[in-house]
Regions:
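Short, glycine-/small-residue-rich phosphate/pyrophosphate-handling segment
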Residues: 94-141
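Alpha-helix boundary/capping detector
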Residues: 79-82, 86, 103, 121, ...
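Gly/Ser/Thr-rich beta-alpha loop segments that engage phosphate groups in nucleotides
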Residues: 64, 70, 108-109, 130, ...
């Protein structure tokens, strides 16, 4: 069985909705999904540990955009993982990234690239969204070749669009397929 950690921070629920779409898709394919957050905000939240990363076969990682960068909670966590990096414990694990912003040009692509940096430093294999996912060409909201994204609106009231949901599902499917091939 493939074990996948879906790690996220969500301020207003958009990134959590994306994490759930990706998680549901992974579970549909038969993965053991471990949904994790950086801090416990609700009773059902499970906080990430470094052991979670060591034990997983693949990782999906997302936060809202913070001026084109990852949320501080995520950065703080990744800064504690030097011991994993020194031992090469995440090398060759497939990973993908996802993000949400308030506006169409609110920094999603920059954030997705920023989310990728610690994964690449750890030697993980970064998976994007290939253009055989037709929603990349049809979306009028979120979705990039760098990863799934969402445009929440200035009051964070936009629900995931059908295109954004399909892109999240495509990301989950691709992550599962690559992790399965590698295992």
């Amino acid at each position: 069985m493939i074990t996948v950690v879906v790690l996220y921070h969500s301020s207003h629920g958009s990134v959590e909705a994306m994490a759930n779409e990706i998680s549901d898709t992974l579970a549909f394919h038969g993965a053991d999904v471990r949904l994790r957050t950086f801090e416990q905000r609700y009773n059902y939240d499970q906080v990430i540990t470094k052991q979670d990363l060591i034990d997983c076969d693949a990782l999906a990682f997302g936060t809202p955009t913070r001026f084109g960068m990852m949320a501080a909670q995520a950065k703080t966590f990744w800064e504690t993982t030097s011991d994993l990096w020194l031992k090469g414990q995440l090398i060759d694990k497939p990973a993908c990234v996802f993000s949400s912003s308030s506006s169409m040009h609110g920094g999603n692509e920059a954030t997705l690239l920023n989310l990728s940096l610690p994964l690449l430093h750890h030697g993980m294999m970064l998976l994007g969204v290939p253009y055989d996912v037709p929603e990349l060409l049809d979306t009028t909201s979120g979705g990039t070749p760098y990863g799934a994204s969402h445009v929440a609106g200035k009051d964070n009231s936009n629900q995931l669009s059908e295109c954004e949901k399909r892109i999240c599902r495509a990301v989950g499917t691709r992550l599962f397929n690559i992790a399965s091939k590698l295992k």
